[in-house]
């Protein structure tokens, strides 16, 4: 018991301190999914405008003008056929936020020191920290569960690993989305499942159904959580037969559990019916799933927010799953079925990188289940002298990595959901962004240290002086008499380079000078024109295709990945592309500007140079 409270105290200190260090609690509820969930609460309790949301959104934008208007977002607040507006996010998170909201609301009204509008500091503090309360409560339950099967030492290592070496920390300190709340829900489900099979009762069956309903109320796709109580304890054909006999002899439980589920999910039925006139309603229309092509491997291993790339300690959990037959057989089948189906559903979603997150966020709610595999892996190591120190080393190493990368996300050094291999390697262990990290982010090409390469020769210099070929301007130029001001998607020119005399692993440096007028200021970085290097073989087959957005480099002396470009100044956008190892004499390179969005920008002095390693 003493160890449990010491662990909880340590986690509480780390999470509360982390929340203040990350220092997003005053802004989190104003943006993104965190805002989408919280709008339910403010609308219901403060403005009573459910189904309209005008007053709620108006007050939001009055206190924080930078907040986007979800009515203007194609995937934001939309209209039903009934003419009511609806929020696509289900009401599980708002329900769990409500007690903390009401505390803040009472404080604001009683003291009169803050507006009782749902957006002032007491609300931001109380609701922003609610997720930490639920995570701590989840850990309280999980510690007790694990100690049934594993030693206090193994339990402590597992709990500290989940708390500080995984992206659960990010989701408890950086955002207030569903996943931290679901962590608690799943811990509660495990606790009730174990208690039910120890001493079955109608009340406990009702409770199990209600918790599955609450989990589904939080994210509808989490209905697969029903597999956990269904499959728990099935370890052989004989135990499967026993389970079937148990269900057949206790139909009252079969009735009670679905009744509990309907009670737990009833609030969502009520909301859907109110806004749409239907009990069953698809709020994610247009945001589809492709169940024929799930992206499980990419979701776990891609540098664009891949789960195990940014949360590598959980590889121990996967490796520990087979070992559960030795240490803890009861959850093994439930883990396999639940995690497998959970991953299949979530990585069939069209936006499988799941912005935002430091590592794929749908896996966070699976951690109460995956804790068993992690414990089995640690137990296996502890029984072998040559592996005994590995769990502690892993805990320390991956905690440092996780906390450091959380800080990097906060500083804008990394952006995991838009990451790539080159960007990951360029930013690993860096304290500030660099020009090369920005180039790598844009191009997914590792960039050379310029001290390690030497210029061989210039290859191309295009000043856009031919006014018969290009749309030009003469009043703003970088060099010469004219500069390019052409919004066509493709120019009637590209640099075509013969690569016959070049060596494999040589470098092409490609750059262009750019200028944005005040009236042409760009507000969305994904609508920027790009500078492209394309390498093709003798048959015209593409072998390499690399590009960078041009305007984010303008005036970006800090080399951050967020800017769209400063106005009224010239600057250069450039990057290096390495020629492939298998380079053949008949291959060629094409260099061109691709302006699919039709960005208005002045370009001048495009160049290509050949470099070679010293």
Predicted regions located by residue number:
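Extracellular and organelle-lumenal recognition/adhesion modules and their flexible linkers in secreted
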Residues: 444-614
């Amino acid at each position: 018991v003493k160890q449990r409270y010491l662990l909880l105290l340590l986690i509480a200190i780390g999470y509360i301190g982390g929340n203040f260090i990350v220092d997003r609690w005053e802004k989190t509820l104003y943006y993104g999914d965190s805002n989408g969930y919280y709008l339910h609460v403010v609308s219901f309790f403060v403005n009573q405008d459910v189904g309209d949301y005008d007053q709620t959104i108006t007050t939001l934008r009055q206190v924080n003008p930078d907040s986007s208007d979800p009515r203007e977002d194609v995937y934001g607040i939309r209209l039903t056929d009934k003419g009511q507006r609806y929020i696509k996010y289900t009401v599980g998170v708002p329900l769990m936020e409500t007690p903390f909201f009401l505390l803040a609301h009472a404080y604001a009204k009683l003291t009169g020191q803050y507006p009782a509008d749902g957006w002032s500091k007491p609300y931001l503090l109380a609701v922003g920290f609610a997720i930490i309360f639920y995570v701590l409560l989840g850990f309280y339950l999980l510690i007790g569960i694990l100690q049934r099967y594993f030693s206090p030492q193994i339990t402590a290592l597992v709990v500290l690993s989940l708390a500080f070496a995984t992206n659960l920390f990010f989701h408890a300190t950086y955002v207030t989305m569903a996943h931290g709340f679901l962590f608690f829900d799943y811990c509660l489900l495990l606790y009730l499942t174990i208690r039910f099979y120890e001493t079955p009762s109608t009340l406990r069956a009702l409770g199990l159904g209600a918790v599955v309903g609450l989990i589904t109320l939080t994210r509808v796709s989490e209905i697969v959580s029903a597999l956990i109580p269904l499959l728990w304890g099935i370890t052989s054909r004989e135990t499967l037969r026993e389970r079937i006999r148990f269900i057949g002899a206790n139909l009252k439980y079969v009735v009670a559990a679905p009744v509990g589920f309907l009670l737990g999910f009833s609030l969502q039925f009520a909301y859907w019916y109110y806004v749409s006139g239907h009990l069953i309603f698809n709020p994610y229309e247009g945001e589809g799933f492709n169940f024929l092509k799930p992206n499980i491997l990419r979701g776990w291993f891609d540098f664009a927010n891949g789960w195990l790339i940014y949360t590598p300690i959980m590889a121990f959990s996967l490796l520990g799953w087979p070992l559960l037959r030795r240490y803890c057989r009861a959850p093994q089948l439930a883990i396999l079925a639940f995690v497998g189906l959970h991953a299949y559903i979530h990585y069939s979603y069209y936006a499988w990188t799941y912005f935002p997150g430091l590592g794929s966020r749908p896996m966070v709610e699976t951690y109460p289940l995956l804790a068993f595999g992690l414990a089995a892996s640690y137990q296996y190591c502890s029984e072998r002298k040559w592996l005994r120190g590995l769990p502690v080393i892993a805990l320390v190493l991956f905690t440092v990595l996780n906390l450091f990368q959380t800080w990097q996300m906060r500083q804008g050094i990394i952006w995991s959901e838009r990451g790539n291999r080159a960007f990951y390697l360029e930013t690993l262990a860096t304290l500030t962004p660099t020009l090369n990290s920005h180039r790598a982010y844009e191009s997914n090409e590792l960039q050379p240290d310029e001290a390690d390469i030497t210029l061989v020769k210039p290859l191309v210099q295009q000043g856009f002086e031919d006014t018969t070929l290009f749309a030009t301007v003469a009043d703003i130029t970088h060099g010469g008499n004219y500069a390019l001001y052409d919004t066509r998607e493709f120019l009637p020119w590209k640099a075509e380079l013969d690569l016959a005399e070049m060596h494999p692993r040589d470098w092409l440096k490609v750059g262009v000078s750019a200028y944005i007028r005040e009236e042409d200021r760009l507000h969305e970085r994904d609508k920027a024109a790009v500078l492209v290097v394309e390498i093709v073989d003798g048959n015209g087959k593409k072998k390499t295709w690399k590009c960078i957005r041009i305007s984010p480099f303008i005036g970006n002396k800090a080399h951050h990945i967020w800017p769209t470009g400063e106005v009224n100044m010239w600057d250069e956008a450039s990057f290096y592309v390495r020629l492939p190892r298998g380079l053949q004499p008949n291959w060629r390179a094409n260099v061109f500007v691709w302006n699919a969005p039709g960005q208005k920008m002045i370009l001048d002095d495009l160049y290509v140079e050949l470099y070679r390693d010293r």
